[in-house]
Amino acid sequence: MLADKLTPFINRYNELGEMLSSPDITSDIKRMTTLSKERSSLEKIVEKAQEYKSVISQINDTKEMLYDAEMAEMAKEELKELEIQIPILENDIKLLLLPKDPNDDRNIIVELRAGAGGDEAAIFVGNLFEAYTRYADLKDWKVEILSSSPSDAGGYKEIIALIRGEQVYSRLKYEGGTHRVQRVPATESQGRVHTSAITVAVMPEVDDVEIQINENDLKIDVMRSSGCGGQSVNTTDSAVRITHLPTGLVVTNQDQKSQHKNKEKAMKVLKARLYDLEMQEAIAKDSANRSAQVGTGDRSGRIRTYNYPQNRMSDHRITLTLYRLAEIMQGGLMDEIIEPLIADHQSKIVEAAGL
């Protein structure tokens, strides 16, 4: 029973309360801080657990009243109201019992790349990046472009950005995958709909402590920066290309005039890619964990279609279709895509955990 699974949380919460009132703990600031954080992390689930147990107790008491002729009718009404609360509380508790993604609080590095479709794909990279930027503005997040490769036709062949803020990874991790766009290009005289595709990768930002890179594993090349059409935009060798020899990962950055700054940004992207690689390998080795990575793991899969003539956006992972594409691309409706993805993700974890 669910109630039995809640007992250890309540016991630990009470135990921590007693420990925090002990003179031995109050005199040790570091230990007290650690225990306080642990107790605080249990507060929500303990509150729900106590509410759940209270409702069950009230249901049992009310059932006893059914045998009293004078109280039976009133008891039936009370019982209905109480029993309605049980599935709601159980769902709330199950969500609180889910293992937390340790990366959810992190900032992200997001990479958008043009795929099939040539100029149209590059233009859509620009469109989708603008949608993410507008969404970030609504969330009070900060966007910093780390690297970009503009396209002659508009948009970008590739753009890499750092997005900082509260719960960024938890919201945008579902964007990883192939995004397909269907629309009539501006240069199309016959009005035919063209299909193109771009890829999006979303990686948690990591610090130097988490990813240690041996300098001997790096091959660093410097060169002159180039702009659209390949023309030189800098007379100094400021562009940097870093190759991580053990994995073959290559990162290039030329956005800054300073070679040092370009190297710093390239290293930030490389660390994120290495961390992401480790994370994906760990998921692949753990089948139980892999089954829980709904919407975050398969980078090659087509996750979404944007059909401009129909004003339609379809997310293929959860068969979600919205006929409000214009508003979505303005960033204002992004939550209407993300919330159902989170709900689907959580329901699959609940099922996998047997809750």
From Swiss-Prot:
Superkingdom in the source lineage: Bacteria
Annotated compartments: Cytoplasm
Annotated keywords: Cytoplasm, Methylation, Protein biosynthesis
Pfam family, one: RF-1
InterPro entries according to UniProt: PCRF (IPR005139), Pep_chain_release_fac_I (IPR000352), Pep_chain_release_fac_I_sf (IPR045853), Prokaryotic/Mito_RF (IPR050057), RF-1 (IPR004373)
SUPFAM superfamilies reported for this sequence: Release factor (SSF75620)
GO molecular function: translation release factor activity, codon specific
Modified residues (N5-methylglutamine): 231
PTM per Swiss-Prot/TrEMBL: Methylated by PrmC. Methylation increases the termination efficiency of RF1.
GO cellular component: cytoplasm
PANTHER family: LD18447P
Family note: Belongs to the prokaryotic/mitochondrial release factor family.
Listed NCBIfam families: prfA (TIGR00019), PRK00591.1 (NF001859)
Described function: Peptide chain release factor 1 directs the termination of translation in response to the peptide chain termination codons UAG and UAA.
Protein name per the record: Peptide chain release factor 1
Organism of derivation: Sulfurimonas denitrificans (strain ATCC 33889 / DSM 1251) (Thiomicrospira denitrificans (strain ATCC 33889 / DSM 1251))
Gene: prfA
